[in-house]
UniProtKB/Swiss-Prot annotation:
The gene is lptD. It is found in: Cell outer membrane. InterPro entries: LipoPS_assembly_LptD, LptD, LptD_C. This is LPS-assembly protein LptD. Keywords: Cell outer membrane, Membrane, Signal. It comes from Albidiferax ferrireducens (strain ATCC BAA-621 / DSM 15236 / T118) (Rhodoferax ferrireducens). Component of the lipopolysaccharide transport and assembly complex. Interacts with LptE and LptA.
Length: 799
């Protein structure tokens, strides 16, 4: 029979020497049989209070002063000298539990000795073995022949001995380490196991360090590791990361050995030297920082000698965001000035083609932005000072005209709303446009424009109408004369528009389901007189894409160099089906079309023909989410004259739960492109009826599961795969295997291919090329089989 003593209420003065409580009890003749307090039926229940003992981490300063609870079948000893517990002996204090057949405590040395079926549970970490010696206050001691389990990463193993240095650090000698679930039976062997001469554990930093280690997989020695640092949780730590191996048809075999430097909680850096068999050595570095009023990231790739190009290659990306608040900003604004930097530079025109998987995705584009701006607001004013410079990476087979640099751009806006029912705003902008005239065939210039806008919205639940008057004023000063000899030009363009719409609602029932259905007709009229703009250079204007978002706008161009002459009426109607209980949209259908009352003579280029069609293409759109698992959307641009589709997009997605998603999209543009895009992630075991377990996102679906992942982009015009990602993942519980093939097209005649193979030993490390970024970027709805979640509570492994 077990008896328990709770000595806390009467013996607080012995709290610093916990087991001395027992000696005092023996002297006082306290019965070993604990007495249970009785509460009178008419007394109110005792109120619950928060306790520091229920915190996930017990503070070290608090731990030594906590009360101790002991129990055993037999308790005896000498006061102030020793106490002995025999038979199911148990000691509890804070987050520490010690169980054994026999437990001795020597009070002068504060040394506890436990023998026979000894178990320690400290904050969820468990050690079991035959013999323990431990100083309770300092947690110094040793444990012979222990078996152990660590809560944070679900790892376990056994060793010859554990030396406890203090309450946060320990050294395990001749140790094993694995996260594979132990199965019953003496013949069980884990799929992977790390054997080490010693493993040092630092629970304060959540870091484990193995020395003289050997990693075995499926019983085969895989990799000797003289030194390995691994995490005990998801906490960041400095150290060498697992090597990354790769095979590329352009760069050849690749070997990378990253080093991560955890500079501070708000700063870190990663250095990654990479050896490419065909090119040479590439040095990559990344620095991140985060402060209360600024944050940023710097990435630099340097290849001192590219053997294929016989030159030095480099790429730089720098982003920085800050809020400046000091003496020189106060005259402008009390809220501070926002600073934004986005700088991207590379060594040469071929960088984007040769390094398609650069550490910064922005460097794989052909137009690289270098943008710096200051912006601030004060009352109804908002202001921006900006410089924008482009680096254009030219391709001989497909040259592009570089956009204009803005050196500088000054913009301000003043806006008021609901002033006697009216809304008005004034926008002003000064920009200096600069580029290579030999490429743009236009003079550099300074442009000043201002847009004045006045509107009077009437809005009710049943509809709205908003008349608006707009005046666009522009002035140009050219560095060199235009073709007509002019060195300056001006333009004033007024615009009148009226936007209106109605909303009708009714209860409806379709396919046995109740809905709230809306009918929303909309009419938009715009009138802008013609102003001859054929001689004006074009610095920042382009044609507006024709879609549902732009069909109700007053200008056929974006930018400020072209203002289209318009006499248009846009008519459209949409209907929505809403869930009457939640208001969620179940389906939406829409149609819209423009009616043109006169020709549009303003065009993007002087050689372009005027727009004479009286009726525009018809836009048809639909989006259906009838079932939470299914999503369907489609947009069709139909030409009523030719009776043909000009552009169509049809997409569907099926998501049956975690790790089960399939998406398909068809995109067609007449005389330009026709593509089919399919992406998926799906458990292969479903094919033979094994549904797996529903463990939630980031935890997989149980052991022994295969997953197929991929995305295929097929050009039906060229009859070939443009881009492709295809692979398989295997989840064994304690390890994951991935093999992925990737093809990225870099030009009409060339593509980069690579194979990515990775073994992830859960809770320890990864070996191989990491395909996860490629899978996440390319496959819609892709989910990681393992993803960092909140650490488990110590009470989940409570004794």
């Amino acid at each position: 029979m077990m008896h328990e003593l709770d000595l806390r209420p009467h013996l607080a003065r012995f709290a610093q020497r916990p087991l001395a409580l027992l000696a005092w009890a023996l002297l006082q003749g306290t019965s070993v049989n604990a007495q249970v307090a009785q509460v009178a039926p008419d007394e109110p229940p005792l109120p619950l209070k928060t306790s520091p003992l229920l915190q996930e981490q017990v503070a070290p300063a608090l731990r030594s002063s906590l009360p101790t609870f002991i129990s055993a079948e037999h308790i005896f000893g000498r006061p102030d000298l020793e106490t002995v517990l025999e038979g199911r002996a148990e000691l509890r204090r804070g987050d520490l539990v010690i169980k054994a057949d026999r437990l001795e405590y020597d009070q002068p040395s504060d040394l506890a000795t436990a023998s026979g079926n000894v178990l320690i549970n400290r904050a969820g970490n468990v050690y079991e073995g035959p013999l323990l010696e431990l100083k309770l206050d300092t947690f110094e001691g040793f444990f012979n022949q222990p078996r152990y389990y660590f809560l944070k990463n679900d790892a376990h193993g056994q060793a010859d001995r554990v030396d406890f240095i203090d309450d946060q650090r320990a050294v395990i000698h001749n140790a094993t380490f694995t996260t594979c679930r132990r199965l019953p039976g003496p013949s069980w062997l884990p799929d992977w196991i790390l054997r080490a001469a010693s493993i040092s554990l630092d629970n304060e930093e959540d870091v484990g360090t193995a020395k003289g280690a050997l990693l075995s997989f499926k019983g085969v020695p895989l990799l000797p590791i003289p030194y390995l640092s691994f995490p005990l949780s998801d906490k960041r730590k400095s150290g060498v990361l697992p090597p990354i191996l790769g095979l590329d048809n352009v760069n050849g075999a690749e070997v990378s050995v990253p080093y991560y430097w955890n500079i501070a909680p708000n700063r870190d850096a990663t250095f990654t030297p990479t050896l490419m068999s065909k090119r040479g050595v590439n040095l990559s570095s990344e620095l991140r920082y985060l402060e209360a009023d600024y944050a940023g990231q710097v990435q630099l790739d340097l290849m001192p000698s590219d053997q294929l190009r016989d030159s030095t290659r480099w790429g730089l990306t720098y982003t920085h965001q800050a809020t400046l608040q000091n003496s020189w900003t106060r005259p402008f604004t009390a809220g501070g000035v926002a600073l934004n930097l986005n700088l991207n530079r590379v060594s040469d025109d071929n960088y984007w083609r040769d390094f398609t998987r650069a550490s910064t995705g922005s460097l794989t584009q052909r137009l690289l932005t270098n943008d710096a701006s200051l912006s601030w607001t004060e009352g109804n004013f908002s202001n921006t000072v900006r410089t924008l410079k482009w680096q254009t990476l030219q391709d001989v087979s497909a040259p592009i005209t570089p956009p204009y640099d803005r050196l500088p751009q000054l913009a301000t806006r003043y806006a008021r709303s609901n002033v006697g029912g009216f809304d008005y705003s004034v926008d002003a902008d000064y920009t200096r446009f600069q580029s290579e005239r030999s490429l743009t065939l236009q003079p550099n210039a300074q442009r000043v424009f201002s847009v004045l806008q006045l509107s009077r919205p009437w809005v009710t639940a049943a509809g709205f109408i908003t008349p608006k008057l707009q005046l666009n004023v522009s002035n140009y000063q050219f560095d060199t004369p235009l073709s007509n000899g002019a060195r300056a030009a001006s333009r004033v363009v007024p615009t009148l528009s009226v936007d209106s719409g109605l909303v009708f609602e009714r209860d409806a029932r379709y396919f046995g389901m109740n809905f709230r259905q809306t009918l929303e007709p909309r009419a938009f009229y715009v009138n802008t007189p013609f102003r001859d703009q054929r001689l004006l250079p074009n610095y920042d204007s382009g044609a507006v894409d024709f879609n549902f978002a732009t069909i109700y706008t007053d200008n056929a161009f974006v930018g400020n160099d072209r203002i289209s002459d318009s006499d248009l009426l846009t008519l459209g109607v949409s209907t929505r089906l809403l869930d009457p209980a939640t208001g969620a949209q179940v389906a939406r259908f829409g149609v819209a079309q423009r009616l043109r009352f006169r020709d549009q003579n303003v065009t993007l280029l002087p050689t372009d023909a005027p727009v004479t069609d009286r009726i525009s293409d018809l836009l048809l759109g639909a989006a259906v989410n009838w079932d939470p698992k299914w999503a369907f959307d489609s947009t069709v641009q139909f030409n009523p004259t030719t009776k043909q589709s000009v552009r169509s997009t049809i997409g569907a997605r099926y998501s049956a739960g975690h790790y089960r998603t399939v998406s398909a999209a068809y995109r067609y543009q007449r005389e330009s492109s026709e593509q089919l895009d399919i992406g998926w992630q799906w458990p292969i075991n479903d094919l033979w009826g094994e549904r797996g377990q529903e463990l939630g996102a980031g935890r997989g679906q149980g052991e022994g599961r295969w997953y197929s992942v991929g995305r295929l982009n097929y050009s039906m015009q060229e009859r070939k795969l443009v881009d492709a990602v295809l692979g398989f993942e295997y989840d064994a519980g304690c390890w994951l295997g991935r093999i992925v093939l990737e093809q990225l097209q870099t030009s009409t005649a060339s593509a980069n291919q690579r194979i990515m193979f990775q073994l992830e030993f859960v809770g320890l490390t990864r070996l191989g090329v990491n395909p996860l970024k490629s899978l996440k970027d390319n496959i819609p709805g892709y989910q990681y089989l393992r993803e960092q979640t909140s650490p488990p509570s110590r009470f989940s492994n409570y004794d």
